[in-house]
A protein has these predicted regions:
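A short, N-terminal "cap"/entry segment at the start of jelly-roll beta-barrel domains
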Residues: 1-30
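Ligand-binding loop in jelly-roll beta-barrel domains
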Residues: 19, 79-104
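Short histidine-centered beta-strand/loop micro-motifs
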Residues: 25-26, 34-36, 45-49, 66-67, ...
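Short, charged/polar surface micro-motifs in flexible loops or helix N-caps
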Residues: 29-31, 40-42, 101
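Structural motif
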Residues: 31-35, 55, 91-92
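Glycine- and acidic-residue-biased ligand/ion/polar-headgroup-sensing regions
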Residues: 40, 49-64
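Short acidic-glycine-tyrosine-enriched beta hairpin
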Residues: 64-84
Length: 105
């Protein structure tokens, strides 16, 4: 069993300015589960994953691949599906990917 308390999250910069990640775990196939925090206007460039990815919006509004998502919305992407992520407002999302993420843009 692995437990990560919200109060104990360790936020680290995650590439683009205004994007931070709190890692829950890395898996054996190179994927990971984490919470990502985006400032309004922050953008994760277009990319794809070698495996499937699941996203749940916990707070705020984001667009992923041009689709607007709000608190409670869920998105599943297949391996190889390209998308970017933009913080329409300050936002927090849960992201779980099966495999590593190669950059596209």
């Amino acid at each position: 069993m692995l437990l990560k308390k919200a109060a104990e999250r360790d936020w680290k910069p995650a590439g683009p300015e205004g994007v931070e990640r709190s890692l829950f775990r890395n898996n054996d196939t190179g994927g990971r589960s984490s919470v990502v925090r985006l400032k309004q206007g922050a953008r994760v460039p277009r990319h794809a994953h070698h495996g499937n990815e699941e996203v749940v919006v916990l707070e705020g509004i984001v667009t992923i691949g041009g689709v607007e998502m709000r608190e409670g919305d869920y998105l599943y992407t297949e391996a190889g599906e390209e998308h970017d992520v933009v913080g329409v407002t300050d936002a927090v999302i849960f992201v779980s990917s099966q495999k590593a993420t190669p950059a596209v843009e």
